[in-house]
């Protein structure tokens, strides 16, 4: 599979220049940008795993401390949200990128908006629940996990098994 992220992004940029009111061009460019970052991240992580000159604990620490810049992809989703404010997937995708950027409260807001627009959006409940559990709001997180499970997200039950027990926080 040939990954031509740079040329794809350039093509979306040219299309946006010709048609700046098409929200799907911004969504697609954002997706391409985030896929490129994920691909680069996987190469970085793979390189760190095979590096011989560092001990495993420092490689693990380096991997977990690295944050990639999703700001351009988020900016594209901001534009798409202005053009198509009732499309739940924009908020869900932006929530994912905000989470990857460490901006958890903003991610929760976007997942909440996605759920408001599409109350049967199980993945949004699941992701919001994960963040709430991560932020130590286990009660709210478990409520979201329960709803995600009801909506067909089976892995939510595994999370509930761990965090939904009395005394687990």
Language-model features: locations:
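Alpha-helical tetratricopeptide repeat
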Residues: 1-169
């Amino acid at each position: 599979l040939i990954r031509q992220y740079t040329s794809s992004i350039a093509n979306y940029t040219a299309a946006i220049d010709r048609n700046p009111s098409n929200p799907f061009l911004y969504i697609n460019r954002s997706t391409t940008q985030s896929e490129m970052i994920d691909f680069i991240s996987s190469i970085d992580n793979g390189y760190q795993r095979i590096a011989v000159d560092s001990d495993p604990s420092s490689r693990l620490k380096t991997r977990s401390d690295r944050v990639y810049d999703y700001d351009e992809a988020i900016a594209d989703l901001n534009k798409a949200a202005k053009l198509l404010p009732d499309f739940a997937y924009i908020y869900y995708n932006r929530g994912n990128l905000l989470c990857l950027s460490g901006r958890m409260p903003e991610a929760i807001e976007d997942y909440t908006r996605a759920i408001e627009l599409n109350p049967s959006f199980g993945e949004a409940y699941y992701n919001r629940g994960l963040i709430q559990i991560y932020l130590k709001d286990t009660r709210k997180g478990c409520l979201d996990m329960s709803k995600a499970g009801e909506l067909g997200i089976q892995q939510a039950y595994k999370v509930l098994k761990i965090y939904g027990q009395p005394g687990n926080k």
